[in-house]
Amino acid sequence: MRNSITSSIAHLELGKRHRIGLELPIKTRFKNPKNRMKTCSRREEEAPPQESLQKLIAYQISQGDSAPIRPAPRERRWMEDAEEKAPYRCLPLIVANQYGWEILSTHHVRASWDGTSTYEGLCVESLGGDGPLHCYSHFGEGVLTFQIPFLFKTPRGWNLMVRGPTNSAKDGIQALDGIIETDWAHSTFTMNWRFTRACTVEFAVTEPICLFFPIRRGVLQMFRGEFRMLEADLEFESKFRKWSASRNQFLSGLEKGKPEVVAQGWQKDYMQAAKQRKPLAHPFANENAVDRARTGECGP
């Protein structure tokens, strides 16, 4: 099957380019070095100094052809609907939900696939929306393609990881992942979803159709995985054993219905980072606002 992330088709109009800048922190610092993770994450990150910020630019290719970009939110509908909103107790979920930026659909799209491999086997229609329709059948094989109306540029050595919205399963269709070398590539890319069966799916107006975030090129080659017994690191083992004993004691108390444990509901000592309600990612802004942020200037 063809690559899931590819250059946009040739009929994409190349018009006046506008750019939207973003400040991307490349490192953060702890307010208090002792305020580290007790069992999972106790870190409270302070804003990085302005000189450590780098730009992630989204060049708008054509006048009148755009799409909303927002920091990925912490909330998910299925998490909201769960009993007592229990999934929000999982810190890894909350952090992952917010890791990146989402591109939103500009149309209410209905797509139907008949199960065949031809591109004619996928029918796409707009049920309403503004601007050009960015969704169509191009590759066949049950792949639904969203045209992205931006050309992204990252600093040297940085790629973009492009995928579907995190922890947001969609019945009947699956987002395909891709990594774009946006520090040198001067071609656009498409976001693609592949049907898992012959069916009809819909994407609502402002529904996320793409999530992206920067990743440093070559970082995998910097690591060498190795196996060790936990007892090889006595301090690390001691911390784990204390956590494990505490967790087992808590779960035993729940099972036995101990009032003080039931009243507590769940252990919260690893949830410090989740108390920070601010999005992890900075919102996109026009280039003048970004430049003022870098220099510390004020004003509209």
Regions found by a protein language model. Give the residues of each.
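Aromatic sugar-binding surface patches on proteins
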Residues: 184-192
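Non-catalytic terminal segments and appended small domains
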Residues: 1-185, 199-300
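Short alpha-helix capping/helix-loop boundary micro-motifs
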Residues: 193-198
